[in-house]
From Swiss-Prot:
Disulphide-bridged cysteine pairs: C131-C134
Listed EC numbers: 1.11.1.28
InterPro entries per UniProt: AhpD, AhpD-like, AhpD_core, CMD-like
Domain of life: Bacteria
UniProt keyword terms in alphabetical order: Antioxidant, Disulfide bond, Oxidoreductase, Peroxidase, Redox-active center
Name assigned to this protein: Alkyl hydroperoxide reductase AhpD
One GO biological process term: response to oxidative stress
SUPFAM superfamilies: AhpD-like
Job description of the protein: Antioxidant protein with alkyl hydroperoxidase activity. Required for the reduction of the AhpC active site cysteine residues and for the regeneration of the AhpC enzyme activity.
Length: 175
């Protein structure tokens, strides 16, 4: 399955989603590694099998397997961190902020790819998962690494498009 296959499954009520998928596929704001890593990480984070399969397949022929593995790791580790840190951020009891997380997250310091790319993928997945604390932390790391606001915005735009594709497919499944 490819992005074109995915677009063909998007119903007419979500025509904008199809158009956004097309623009995302041809976007050149990011490096190929950043772009296809986002496809994989956000496809997994969308929790939709069709979206995940299409985007992983799209990336498979365009980047090294290590990029795909690292993007999978970003989605996985953010699945854990986004839940934990969203709780810490939203809980009325601020004592949780001073407690050690006691969660293993070694992959963040040694992702096997450029750390900036891994941070970009982590930011996008954090946006999908709605963890404001994680969004702020990853955006700060990216800005300190001189990543442009346009690149950061592109990553979050990709995340929003990918998530909307998953929702459109779920909505179509109710017809």
């Amino acid at each position: 399955m490819s992005i074109d296959d995915l677009k063909s499954k998007i119903p007419d009520f979500a025509k904008d989603v199809r158009l956004n998928l097309s623009s995302m596929a041809s976007d050149e704001t990011l490096t190929p590694q950043q772009k296809y890593g986002l496809f994989v990480a956000c496809g997994i984070a969308s929790r939709n099998a069709d979206v995940r399969k299409a985007l992983v397949a799209e990336a498979a022929g365009k980047v090294d397997a290590s990029v795909i593995q690292a993007a999978k790791a970003a989605a996985s580790i953010m699945g854990m961190n986004n839940v934990y840190y969203r709780f810490v951020h939203l809980a009325s009891n601020k004592d949780y902020r001073t407690m050690p997380a006691r969660l293993r997250m070694n992959v963040i310091s040694n992702p096997g790819v450029d750390k900036v790319d891994f941070e970009l993928w982590s930011l996008a997945v954090s946006a999908i998962n709605g963890c404001g604390m994680c969004i702020d932390a990853h955006e700060d790391v990216l800005r300190k690494a001189n990543v442009t606001a346009e690149a950061i915005q592109a990553a979050v735009r990709f995340a929003s498009i990918i998530q909307s594709a998953a929702i459109a497919l779920e909505a179509a499944d109710t017809e």
